[in-house]
Every structure is written in structure tokens, then in C-alpha cells.
From Swiss-Prot:
Induction: Induced by phthalate and repressed by glucose. Keywords: Aromatic hydrocarbons catabolism, Oxidoreductase, Plasmid. The gene is pht4. It is an enzyme of class 1 (oxidoreductase). It holds the Pfam family GFO_IDH_MocA. This is Putative 4,5-dihydroxyphthalate dehydrogenase. Pathway: Xenobiotic degradation; phthalate degradation; 3,4-dihydroxybenzoate from phthalate: step 2/3. It comes from Pseudomonas putida (Arthrobacter siderocapsulatus). Its EC number is 1.-.-.-. Transforms 4,5-dihydro-4,5-dihydroxyphthalate to 4,5-dihydroxyphthalate. Signal peptide: none annotated. One of its GO terms (molecular function) is oxidoreductase activity. InterPro entries: Gfo/Idh/MocA-like_OxRdtase_N (IPR000683), Gfo/Idh/MocA_Oxidoreductases (IPR051450), GFO_IDH_MocA-like_dom (IPR055170), NAD(P)-bd_dom_sf (IPR036291).
């Protein structure tokens, strides 16, 4: 069942918890998708609250408690810092609001379990996203796998090289113990995608993480192998130190589905060189997000030309290879090579609204529910532990590890 943008008459009244970077990335979706109406928000920054009230003629509160109590709100989009996700979900559920919470779902499996229980007890839906496993190229690739034409998935290769760690960050974003670093922020995407494509439960993880910039004391890179119950395995690699850009291998289409100028190389590092202290860096980040002095509102004509993505991926099946791109899926059969074009997106990240809308108005259980996101977090935690202990980690058997919390720079 799919409620299209044109066919839908009822609108989902959404409140936003946190008007920072995540909201900035979702805002083009909220503006373009007629199934959604932004009816409220909360943020500790007065400038962001004022801009929201101007832009949407809707109240902006200082606390989530006030927003959650607003009877005009159907669901809450929780885009607050990672360490607040569990508590903010509890407050939303206590007020009978459906929940769309950003990845990672939380920072521990206990927090995930409480979030799932809180929403179940309140009778509200819990969806975790946006995550790149929502992206249409991966969903279409999964459909091709499901057709049976290519046989079983045997191996998945996924990599992404970005400037993630060179972008302006708040102090907690550079602390693994507080949910910062590439594993919590970026592996949550990559693990989700390979889980979707493998179509099976992961059973074992072996990983190594990289932390080689003393000025950015958290993981900036990782590589891991995942094994699945169905016999498939996946290799995932990420590097956020801002040198090679793997969008070069995606036809110079950036993560957000827009053309990327290769001549802009090094822009994040140049911007970061403007600051000398952690406070200055945090201010620089705030200035570029919603309500900030450098924030640029999305233009109605600034449409993505392709779907969003998370770097090059190749799925090797028994009878062929599949390579999801930003605008197509490359299909490699035994005697032919084809490019299956995808219809250009009209609304970025509309796949997230699909799940939220169907959950709200039709009671459909979402794919990216709490249990799904908990399993992704379990793998991320296992990656940290595997790297620390230099061994394989079996999933489902006490993967939580506290050592990285005590010494996040190790």
C-alpha cells in the first residue's frame, strides 16, 4: 500500500524536536511533500525558534515537554543530539505522539529496548530515519534480488570516502562516549544498507576503526566484515578524513543527490581553518544550520537531479552483480550489461514520509522500526568492541562494551 503525494488528502501534523543539521537536511522533504505539515518545533536556540515561527506560522517552544503537549501535533520528528534520543522518545510516547527519530536510534541497547517498550505501551509507531537504506536505488536493488533472477546474494562491497570529520562539529560529536564519531554517525547508514541488501540477519562482525587526527579525537574511519545467516558476507569501509572523494565513482553526484563540483575539493577543511577553539567551531556549525547567520533556505528550484546515496556498492549474487547508482541500477548479467534508469525524484527522501504516513493513517508496521534500528546499533557497538579487542564479535551475545565509553580516544 502506498499513499501517493497526489492521492493523499489527510496531512500528517508534524512537530520537530531540534532545528539543527538533521532538520536542515530533512527540510526540503517537509516543504515538498504535501502529506506533511510542520505545526510546531522546539529548540534551545532563540534564533532558530524565531525563524521557524516566521517560516511556518507555527509555535516554536524551548522544551520538548511543551511541544509534546501540543494537541495540534500528531507525530514528533526527533532530530536532537544522539544522547537525547531515548529520553525524547519517552516524552513523545507519553504524550501519545508517533515518533520518527534520527539515526543512530540511541547509544546503548538498553536505551533502544526502553524506546521500543515506551512506544509499544503507548500504542504509537516508532520509525528510525532518515537512514540511507530508505533510498530508492537500494530499495529497487532489493526488489531485483527478490525477483530471483540473479540467485542468492553472496557478497556485498560498500565503501564511502567523504570529508565527514572535517566539517564543523560540536564537542560531543568528537567524543565516541557521547555518540560522536564515524561508527555511530556513518556506519549506521552503511550497516543499514547492507542489511537491507543481504536480506538476512547478521551473525558475526570483525572490524578495525581508525583514529589518526589528534585534533579530532574520535573515529574518522573504519572497515568491517559482516557475516549473515544466509551465508552472505559484506565488507564495509568508510573514511571521513577529507582526501579522496568516492563521489568520483558515483558520476560526481553527491550524497544528497545533487551534482558535485570536483573543483570544490578541500572546502570543508578550509572552512574549519577559520576557527581556533571548540567554542568557535560549535558556533560555526550553528551559524550554518537553521536560524544561523550563514544558513541558506532551500530554494524551490534547487531540486535534486538524482536520488540520495551512500557511496559505491556492489552486490554479488550467484548469477550476476548489481550496482545501485544515484539515478539507476547497473545490472551485470552473464552476457549483458544494462543500466536500469530510475524515474527522477520529485521529493527528496519521500521514502521516509511513505513509512511515517502509512504508519500514522493506515497502521502499517514500518520496515525501519525500533527492532530494525536496534539490530543496526548492535552491529555498530560490535564494531567498536571488535576493534578494541581485535577479535570477531558474535551478535546477540552481550555485544555491549563499556571500555570505549571510558576511553573514547583509544
Amino acid at each position: 500500500m502506498m499513499a501517493s503525494h497526489a492521492e493523499s488528502t489527510a496531512r500528517l501534523r508534524l512537530g520537530v524536536v531540534g532545528l539543527g543539521r538533521a532538520f536542515t537536511l530533512m527540510l526540503p522533504t517537509f516543504l515538498a511533500d504535501r502529506r506533511v505539515q510542520l505545526v510546531g518545533a522546539c529548540d534551545p536556540r532563540e534564533q532558530a525558534r524565531r525563524q521557524f515561527e516566521r517560516d511556518f506560522d507555527a509555535p516554536a517552544y524551548e522544551t520538548i515537554e511543551d511541544l509534546a503537549a501540543d494537541s495540534n501535533v500528531d507525530a514528533l520528528y526527533i532530530a536532537s543530539p544522539h544522547q537525547f534520543h531515548a529520553e525524547h522518545t519517552r516524552i513523545a510516547a507519553a504524550n501519545r505522539k508517533h515518533v520518527l527519530v534520527e539515526k543512530p536510534m540511541a547509544l546503548s541497547l538498553d536505551e533502544c529496548d526502553r524506546m521500543i517498550a515506551d512506544c509499544a505501551e503507548a500504542g504509537v509507531k516508532l520509525i528510525v530515519g532518515h537512514c540511507h537504506s530508505f533510498d530508492t536505488p537500494y530499495l529497487r536493488t532489493r526488489e531485483l534480488i527478490g525477483s530471483g533472477e540473479f540467485g542468492a546474494v553472496k557478497m556485498i562491497q560498500a565503501l564511502n570516502y567523504t570529508d565527514y570529520l572535517q566539517r564543523p562539529r560540536r564537542p560531543e560529536e568528537l567524543s565516541t562516549a557521547e555518540g560522536g564519531g564515524a561508527v555511530f554517525s556513518q556506519a549506521a547508514h552503511q550497516v543499514d544498507v547492507v542489511r537491507l541488501l543481504a536480506g538476512s540477519r547478521a551473525t558475526r562482525v570483525r572490524a578495525a576503526v581508525g583514529n589518526w587526527d589528534p585534533a579530532r579525537p574520535t573515529e574518522g574511519a573504519y572497515t568491517a566484515t559482516l557475516w549473515f545467516e544466509n551465508g552472505a558476507f559484506a565488507s564495509i569501509t568508510y573514511n571521513g578524513y577529507g582526501h579522496f572523494d568516492s563521489d568520483e565513482w558515483m558520476d560526481w553526484v553527491g550524497e544528497m543527490g545533487k551534482p558535485k563540483n570536483p573543483e570544490a575539493y578541500g572546502g570543508a577543511r578550509r572552512l574549519l581553518q577559520q576557527v581556533q577553539t571548540a567554542d568557535e567551531e560549535a558556533r560555526l556549525k550553528a551559524e550554518g544550520t537553521y536560524g544561523g547567520t550563514r544558513y541558506v533556505s532551500p530554494s524551490p528550484t534547487d531540486d535534486a537531479t538524482a536520488f540520495q546515496h551512500f557511496g559505491p556498492i556492489i552486490v554479488s549474487c550467484e548469477g550476476g552483480d548489481l550496482r545501485p547508482m544515484a539515478d539507476a541500477v547497473m545490472i551485470y548479467r552473464p552476457h549483458s550489461r544494462d543500466r536500469m534508469m530510475l524515474e527522477r525524484p520529485t521529493v527528496p527522501r519521500s521514502e521516509v514520509i511513505d513509512e511515517l504516513y502509512l504508519a500514522q493513517f493506515y497502521g502499517v508496521t514500518p520496515l525501519h522500526d525500533g527492532e530494525w534500528a536496534r539490530d543496526t546499533l548492535e552491529i555498530c557497538l560490535a564494531m567498536l568492541r571488535s576493534s578494541e579487542e581485535q577479535r570477531d564479535i558474535t551478535l546477540g551475545v552481550n555485544v555491549e562494551d563499556t571500555q570505549w565509553r571510558e576511553n573514547p580516544s583509544s
